[in-house]
């Protein structure tokens, strides 16, 4: 997860093995700093329980843990999670590192106050299924944040998958009807070599109405 996506879907071979190899090939593949757009949207939320889906080396998970969140970081790369765990130990942070494939993992129901899906590019129907499960994992009052490369990135952006079938638009990542949309839009952001075009979804599950006295 990064200003350059951590989980642009590899084109062939075992994705988990390919990401293990990529994460093992250098220090940090992605910046140690949190994604700037995500941080700007989440920094004022009260700390609670968070799930970082496709957490990679854990930079968002570590940032949230530093703010007092109880974080579960889920990824299918053993190497990525090991690097995240090492950084957590260095900084005295507590994160639950969970080895699992986002496309099949049980995310629970009403379990989290925040669910992140940053730059995880999957074809349909996998991405729609994932977002449905992420929505179910939200507790009342919880927030879902999804950011990924937009289809327009192929025309006027840099980086990201070059297969349009893996790219986002506002229709593809529109949330289930039981969530309230706070933002659903295309956004441009600075990137190495130019501008990247992303799709952003920020939604919330409404609080339960109080029972009559």
Feature locations, PLM:
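Conserved SAM/SAH-binding beta-strand->alpha-helix loop
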Residues: 77-79
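A short glycine-rich, Lys/Arg-flanked "PGG" loop and its adjoining helix->strand segment in the class I
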Residues: 128-140
């Amino acid at each position: 997860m990064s200003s350059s996506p951590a989980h642009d879907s590899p084109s062939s071979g075992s994705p988990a093995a390919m990401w293990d190899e990529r994460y093992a090939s250098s220090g940090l593949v992605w910046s140690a700093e949190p994604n700037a757009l995500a941080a700007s949207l989440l920094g004022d939320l009260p700390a609670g329980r968070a799930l970082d889906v496709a957490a990679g080396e854990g930079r968002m998970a570590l940032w949230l843990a530093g703010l007092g969140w109880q974080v579960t970081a889920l990824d299918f790369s053993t190497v990525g999670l090991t690097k995240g765990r090492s950084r957590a130990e260095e900084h005295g942070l507590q994160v639950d590192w969970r080895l699992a494939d986002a496309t099949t993992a049980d995310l629970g129901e009403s379990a989290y106050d925040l669910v992140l899906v940053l730059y995880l590019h999957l074809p349909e129907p996998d991405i729609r299924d994932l977002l449905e499960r992420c929505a179910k994992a939200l507790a009342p009052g919880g927030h879902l944040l999804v950011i990924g490369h937009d289809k327009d990135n192929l025309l006027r952006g840099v980086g990201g998958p070059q297969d349009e079938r893996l790219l986002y638009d506002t229709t593809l990542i529109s949330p289930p009807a039981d969530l309230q949309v706070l933002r659903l839009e295309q956004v441009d952001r600075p990137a190495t070599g130019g501008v990247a075009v992303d799709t952003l979804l920020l939604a919330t599950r409404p609080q339960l109405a109080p029972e009559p006295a």
